[in-house]
Amino acid sequence: MRLLILALLGICSLTAYIVEGVGSEVSDKRTCVSLTTQRLPVSRIKTYTITEGSLRAVIFITKRGLKVCADPQATWVRDVVRSMDRKSNTRNNMIQTKPTGTQQSTNTAVTLTG
């Protein structure tokens, strides 16, 4: 009997875990509730994302892992985003550039006749 009750309790718990938010709106974990007006130094920012929704915002993720929401229309926010994009483009260009000039073939196959 105890095993049956324990099994039913486990099934109910599992069902509640799997079916989260049925009949209700599940909020997005990337939603901002307020925006900061305090400038963040570019050197402390690791990356950013832009959210759309009831409150449009730029979410800066600092090198320490903190998430800071800022107004995308603010001048300092646009400057930081531009700076981050420039860094990203520079990094991507360095990765994608191919060396110029000719390289010697690495094919070392030898044909023996005889």
Curated annotation (Swiss-Prot):
GO terms for molecular function: CCR chemokine receptor binding; chemokine activity; chemokine receptor binding; protein homodimerization activity. GO terms for biological process: antimicrobial humoral immune response mediated by antimicrobial peptide; cell chemotaxis; cell-cell signaling; cellular response to interleukin-4; cellular response to transforming growth factor beta stimulus; chemokine-mediated signaling pathway; inflammatory response; mature natural killer cell chemotaxis. It is found in: Secreted. Residues 1-21 form the signal peptide. One of its GO terms (cellular component) is extracellular region. Residues 91-114 are annotated as: Disordered. Disulfide bonds join C32-C69. Highest level in spleen, lower in peripheral leukocytes and very low levels in lung, colon and small intestine. Its main location: secreted. PANTHER family: CYTOKINE SCM-1 BETA-RELATED, SMALL INDUCIBLE CYTOKINE A. Belongs to the intercrine gamma family. This is Lymphotactin. The lineage of its organism: Eukaryota, Metazoa, Chordata, Craniata, Vertebrata. The gene is XCL1.
